Amino acid sequence: MTMARRSRLILGLLLLPGAAVAQAPRITPAGDPSVQSDSIYRLAVDPRDHPDESAVFLLDDGVIVVEADGRESRTFRQVVQVLKQSAVEGLAEHSFSWSPDNERFTLNWIRVVRPDGSVVSAGPAQQQESDVPAAMGAPVYANRKVLRVSLGGVVVGAIVDFSTTTVKTRAWVPGDFYQWWGVSTGLSVQRSRLIVDAPATESLRIKERNLNFPRQTTRAGDRQVLTWATGGLTQVKPEAYSADSNDVH
């Protein structure tokens, strides 16, 4: 299961042909050089301080690198602490999908650890890759793959840490790029980070909603790197009869 986000940030970009070198951290199955896992695990909370939550995000992270011709790399990492039994099943079962025609998917890692960093499970107990079948009601076939993963050792108090990278080898519409990101997830978030690395010559069309922290922009050579980073976010509780366009959700 990938924990759902609620959108607060939308990015849109139309790029022109060109090439550049990425400046974002290079994340591989060997790890993320910009994040120390032990420091993230130490952010584990006391469940008694979160009586209304079944889980909390210790880290919600995205690193996106786009090129002028529409190629892109998207790496997402989630580190989630289990607080209640009701969250165990969802965090023990995960599925990831991609289009093999123009995408390459990598499960960088998926593991279960304790708050002290000791490993409970270093990888999937079971995993299966298959085609996505066409729906019986409206049988429209799409060439997509799905990877289903089952984890062992997911119990209350454990931490599930996984990272995926999807590389778009060619764009259906050259130069098109769109991404949304939600800082608010519906759960408490200890650390949230989004990095977008794009050609410096391109004008990013950015729409931000209800952010109480500034983004950081740096330039290195012919690249621009935009970072949204914050932390200590408490759960946003829904309000009965509230409007769906209240700039919070």
Tell where the protein language model's regions lie, with residue ranges.
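Bacterial N-terminal signal peptides that target proteins for export
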Residues: M1-L11
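Hydrophobic h-region of N-terminal signal peptides that target proteins for export
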Residues: L13-A22
